[in-house]
Amino acid sequence: MSRDTSANSSGQQNYTWSERVIQITRVTKVVKGGKKLSFRAIIVIGNNQGSVGVGVGKASDVIGAVKKGVSDCKKQIIEFPLTSSSTISHAVEGRFGAASVILKPSVQGSGVIAGGAMRTVIELSGIKNIVAKQLGTKNHLNNAKATINALSKLNSKSSQLSLMSFSN
């Protein structure tokens, strides 16, 4: 499921946001009268220009879960710099729960070499050339959040220089 939405905020640049569903699962809660069925949706949104977010929504129907997931995504968007060859500037590692991911920059034309939920997060963020490996658990939510954790560790040179000058 992919949908494009445009955001225009009073003269600001108009970005096109895409959203994708990573996983929809049926979950149950045991209550006094029996079992209560609900759905959990894991959603990723990105603008293909270095901004991406992962969110989770739970509701009694699938459409409501997806809507709640999208609103959760919008609250958790991160931004990071992309190089001119649409890759990351340096290798990074990210962890969330038992999931751990390794992201390494790759040469022009190699494409996205990644799997699972990590691939969806990388594609929607706008990275075109990268090598990625997920270690540990195969849980979709933990791998997506570990990828977000790794991407949030990326810094531009100007911010690295300001950190170095601040520490001196």
Swiss-Prot record:
GO terms for biological process: translation. It holds the Pfam family Ribosomal_S5. GO terms for cellular component: chloroplast; small ribosomal subunit. One of its GO terms (molecular function) is structural constituent of ribosome. Keywords: Chloroplast, Plastid, Ribonucleoprotein, Ribosomal protein, RNA-binding, rRNA-binding. The N-terminal domain interacts with the head of the 30S subunit; the C-terminal domain interacts with the body and contacts protein S4. The interaction surface between S4 and S5 is involved in control of translational fidelity. NCBIfam families: rpsE_bact. Belongs to the universal ribosomal protein uS5 family. Part of the 30S ribosomal subunit. Contacts protein S4. With S4 and S12 plays an important role in translational accuracy. PANTHER family: MITOCHONDRIAL RIBOSOMAL PROTEIN S5. This is Small ribosomal subunit protein uS5c. It comes from Cyanidium caldarium. The gene is rps5.
